[in-house]
A protein has these predicted regions:
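N-terminal export signals
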Residues: 2-24
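C-terminal segment of N-terminal export signals and the immediately downstream linker at the start
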Residues: 18-49, 153
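Histidine-centered catalytic micro-motifs
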Residues: 79-85, 123
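Acidic/histidine-enriched, glycine/proline-rich intrinsically disordered or flexible terminal extensions
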Residues: 153-184
Length: 184
């Protein structure tokens, strides 16, 4: 047997064993239910006129998926942005929204779904006068759960230079703002 191969085998076996362990690791050993209007961890997150309830945490899926249910009273939404590493998905429960993905804008109502691939600029805005509600999903979750928690805190403790603070927060979490919020 080749001596180099013999010496490399234990190292390779260790790396493969660690990788297999990480792929099979699951933080949720059983299913769970999160009731309507409730957050998975009883946290209260309010961001830009919307309440965000975590339904599936990145901790539940080893970072594979994150789902928020957002109820929005006010019109509008976030600035045009993209994620380096996450796809973002939108499922409308009630109300009307406009969702832009790349150069295309879609008017969405209850039951409609939109997919925004990673690295493609996108944004949404609630356009209806009545309350709006949608599921916002990220795959993989990446740093998005932490982003939402920090955004909520930023709204409670507004810095003097909000534009700079937002740019830094987006950048730290793998996103880039590339335009203003949608006009509707």
């Amino acid at each position: 047997m080749d001596r180099r191969l013999f010496l490399q085998f234990p190292l390779l076996a260790s790396v493969l064993a660690l990788q297999a362990k990480n792929q099979s690791k699951t933080n949720s050993s059983k299913g769970f239910v999160v009731r309507s209007g409730k957050d998975r961890y009883q946290e209260e997150l309010y961001i830009m006129g919307g309440e965000f309830d975590c339904k599936v945490s990145s901790k539940d899926t080893d970072g594979a998926l994150l789902i928020y249910d957002t109820v929005r009273e006010t019109k509008g939404g976030p600035a045009l942005h993209f994620h380096e590493s996450q796809d973002e998905l939108f499922y409308i429960i009630k109300g009307e929204f406009i969702v832009r993905v790349g150069d295309d804008a879609f008017n969405l109502k209850a039951g409609d779904f939109a997919f925004a691939p990673r690295k493609i600029p996108h944004a949404f805005a609630k356009t209806s006068d009545s309350e709006g509600q949608m599921l916002v999903m990220f795959q993989p979750a990446g740093l998005m759960e932490d982003f939402f928690k920090q955004m909520s805190q930023l709204g409670k403790n507004i810095p003097k230079d909000m534009e700079h603070a937002l740019k830094d927060l987006f950048s730290t979490h793998g996103m880039q703002v590339v335009g203003p919020p949608l006009k509707y």
